[in-house]
Amino acid sequence: MDGFEFFSGRSDVVAMICDDRLLDLSESIPSGKVPEPIELDSPRGLDILRHSCAHVLAQAVQSIYGDAKLGIGPFTENGFYYDFSVNEPFSSDSLRVIEDKMREIVHSDQKFVRKVVDRQSAHSQFRDEPFKLEIINATDDTLSIYYNIDADSGSVRWMDFCRGPHLPSTRFIGDAFALTHVSSVYWRGNSDNPQMQRVYGTAWGSAKDLKGYLDRVELAKLVDHRKLGKELDLFSLPDEIGPGLALFHVKGGIIRSEMEQYARLRHLEEGYNFVYSPHITKRDLFERSGHLQWYGQSMFPPMRLDKDSCSQGFDYYLKPMNCPFHSLVFSSQPRSYRQLPLRLAEFGTVYRYEQSGAIHGLARVRGLTQDDAHIYATRESFEDEVSKALQFTISLLGDYGLDQFYIEISTRDASGKFLGSDEDWAYATHILQKVAQDSGLQTRDDPGGAAFYGPKISVQAKDAIGRYWQMSTIQLDFNLPERFGLFYTDRAGERKRPIMVHRALFGSFERFFAVLTEHYAGAFPPWLSPEQVVALPVTSAHIPYLEEFVSRFSSRLIRARVDYMQDRLPKKIRSYVKEKIPFVLVAGDRDLTNRTVAIRFRDGTQISDLPIQKCFDGICASIDRKKQIQTRIDFDSVLE
């Protein structure tokens, strides 16, 4: 019996799970097994829908551009893409033509039919597809080809080398898809390889869901941190410095300083000790840590120095990570179990040679400052430390205004290319899963997503427009304690290897800056705002009154000033609304008499005749409590 028979009458089922394997409905069900259905509107169903849509995209491209060569075409979080080698770049007009062809293919109801083939047959059928041949040659698993079969004639209309699974036919894709944009990429992300055209698309289970997504995309353009960074004078990425190297301006520097100061304070409260390490080091350190072997392609090339003291000199590298330095701090003296857990933190700047095509504003840069920490724990305290690190993560992100999360648990696959024993991996994975479940947050599995040196937890945070960002990682490391010979003395006087945990709660300050800028659409909460209070006199006669009042904020380190410009008051107000100032104060004759001010908020609401003491208390409370204030209602809530 196959899946079609088993789920007959279920038009919403598009694939199945059997023995933890995703299968097409055409696959035979092993005797005695009961498959689970995958509905089209489920997360896995949408993944399959998008994967099948990628195949239709490739079929459409090759039917229009006969010389196009196929790369890869996976599904993504909200859509899909496919890479093509073509003679001329695609244009927006090209995408419209391709999308029309896709709809024609979808409506023709071609069947997706999978066939397992041997290597010789795969080579023969893809002899004119050099990139597919490369994939075939690198594949050790079962080789399978998907054929698109004409509904009327039964002839093969198109084929792709693919693991699957796929929808039963193109008809299941429906009309809720769209091609969104195109970019240039290198094959396999390597600049030594040919350049290709990557066509992106999105696909959903309904037209309503598609519209909702496209609306969010348009909203995302409005809050793009690169756009807002320029408009609000926060940062720039000058060509004179180089790709992925950010320059924070005065206002952006204030925001970043506030971010760092508060994070540092919270780390100290949580028992972390801050250390500092240099930006460069000799080659030997990264050979010892394994970074040159495992991470060398993402490191900047070496600098040959010290030829005056050694004829050959030494290779120095910009550091891509802080962890080897922290392990040297640990090993700098004998350690006892009484000193553990040892929590070493550093806001350390690292340098990674990201491909120029992967660089994206502050979200993906070459020079980044991590809120990095490494915890060295005993086996007995490991679970408690991971739990504390996760709780600290959720609490700290919440203080910055992110409060919706899910957790991804990355485990190893069956490749065997991992450090540490099976027992260690099983133990560590069990602990991470237990801590994640105990947190009460939704969890998702990421099989095969672990690094070679240990499993990890990733905290995914939801922003104001519904996007999830990978924020924090808590990563176990079986590698560095072994490579650096780290030991501590236990109660019995025996030497034991510590368990090492990497964790970065923001990922990097640059990326977190980008996330917060988009989350708040540039209207940062008052405690982060570069300018917090601006006072506008109706006439010059009201300046001394406002100067006296504004001076009170200085004692609380609140960024407040009086506007002395001669422009009309409405024009000034419009200007500060555009600059997203949280508190704009206005004072006229009646305010001088009554010791009041008018306070205006970002949404245009205001409070008139507000006693200055009440105004002062409300602004101070808003900043002290790290509350977002956009409206009069928000302000009233802190006064209660």
UniProtKB/Swiss-Prot annotation:
It is found in: Cytoplasm. Residues 224-525 are annotated as: Catalytic. One of its GO terms (molecular function) is tRNA binding. PROSITE patterns: AA_TRNA_LIGASE_II. Its EC number is 6.1.1.3. GO terms for biological process: threonyl-tRNA aminoacylation. Pfam families: HGTP_anticodon (PF03129), tRNA-synt_2b (PF00587), tRNA_SAD (PF07973). Zn(2+) binds at C323, H374, H502. Keywords: Aminoacyl-tRNA synthetase, ATP-binding, Cytoplasm, Ligase, Metal-binding, Nucleotide-binding, Protein biosynthesis, RNA-binding, tRNA-binding, Zinc. It catalyses: tRNA(Thr) + L-threonine + ATP = L-threonyl-tRNA(Thr) + AMP + diphosphate + H(+). The keyword Endoplasmic reticulum does not apply. The keyword Zinc applies. Binds 1 zinc ion per subunit. InterPro entries: aa-tRNA-synt_IIb, aa-tRNA-synth_II, aa-tRNA-synth_II/BPL/LPL, Anticodon-bd, Anticodon-bd_dom_sf, Thr-tRNA-ligase_IIa, Thr/Ala-tRNA-synth_IIc_edit, ThrRS_anticodon. One of its GO terms (cellular component) is cytoplasm. Its cofactor is Zn(2+). HAMAP family: Thr_tRNA_synth. Catalyzes the attachment of threonine to tRNA(Thr) in a two-step reaction: L-threonine is first activated by ATP to form Thr-AMP and then transferred to the acceptor end of tRNA(Thr). Also edits incorrectly charged L-seryl-tRNA(Thr). Belongs to the class-II aminoacyl-tRNA synthetase family. Homodimer. This is Threonine--tRNA ligase. The gene is thrS.
